């Protein structure tokens, strides 16, 4: 949700953003409903004021023993008109809210303008692409050869894009989680295991409704949705709160399973564990002062880069274009890991600054002193590790000639000093 002052004072800023994002949005309708909303607020306030005045006059007349029939008629007329205005105002507010909650976020000036991922900008690379003197396998074949994943039985009990992790891949998955939590705890992140389901108002605060309804699972006959990431729950964690400025920044490390419909995935991604409906993820989430949020954004990215350097996974950092990044983000970096079996880089991290967009929707503010005005806080989020995708990268990049998988050195202590699968 954008600052309403922009609609009134700088609508061209929003028009420029919509053009850069190539988004079809009824901005004129939003501006018009905002103007009408303001007008109705003034009108209803005037009628409420008059109603209170009449109420006082009635009390005085009754106390003085005077006739109140005429003024009671006026009270009846004013109350009826007020009820009519409030009904109209409710309709206008509903239209305004629907549009205000779907307009995308502003875009940082450094973001490349383009229609899709072809306009993304490579910022840097790390690590050497592994070279093999033998025919390599992708993770799907390796999973079958080493009995690490059972896709057929998962499809039987749950459908496509589910899986059973088995044997040492279960341990490797858990080692990634434990290493990630230790890594963030050392950097003074507070560890959080959130609810795996949240209500609609919380989900709408964290994500644009049209977007989440396409990818998030709804719990039937309940006001609950399965989280697609712990970001959703952590964004809503401080909803309707005023945070003390001295406590900022707040850095959370969220650990949770994630549930996504992943509609539209095709090709090789329909098999294996790269693109699935359920996976484990460790997420960075930060509440920051407005003046600090861009610094925090770069810091979160650096934390994620360091994590993959420790895992010795070759990767690159991409700055997403206006056509490829999410609507709630003002700027997004992706980290893409090298997948040897696919001979390409694939996304494993998304790191975004949402400015005050989520905070306005969720009513999260901060203040420095008790008697000072409050400000909307800035929220930022970044994947640290979505384990199934990183398992794919490890399986493909660390495979050996005899068909085994070398365990990254930093994870060996989490697996009883085991060196290979």
UniProtKB/Swiss-Prot annotation:
Enzyme nomenclature, EC number: 6.1.1.11
Source organism, top-level taxon: Archaea
InterPro entries: aa-tRNA-synt_IIb, aa-tRNA-synth_II, aa-tRNA-synth_II/BPL/LPL, Ser-tRNA-ligase_type_1, Ser-tRNA-synth_1_N, SerRS_1_N_sf, SerRS_core, tRNA-bd_arm
GO cellular component: cytosol
Binding site for ATP: 260-262, 276, 347-350
Binding residues for L-serine: 229-231, 283, 383
Catalytic activity: tRNA(Ser) + L-serine + ATP = L-seryl-tRNA(Ser) + AMP + diphosphate + H(+); tRNA(Sec) + L-serine + ATP = L-seryl-tRNA(Sec) + AMP + diphosphate + H(+)
Alphabetic keyword roster: Aminoacyl-tRNA synthetase, ATP-binding, Cytoplasm, Ligase, Nucleotide-binding, Protein biosynthesis
Transferase keyword on record: no
PANTHER family hit by this protein: SERYL-TRNA SYNTHETASE
Family listed: Belongs to the class-II aminoacyl-tRNA synthetase family. Type-1 seryl-tRNA synthetase subfamily.
Protein name: Serine--tRNA ligase
Species of origin: Nitrosopumilus maritimus (strain SCM1)
Phylogenetic lineage: Archaea, Nitrososphaerota, Nitrososphaeria, Nitrosopumilales, Nitrosopumilaceae
Gene: serS
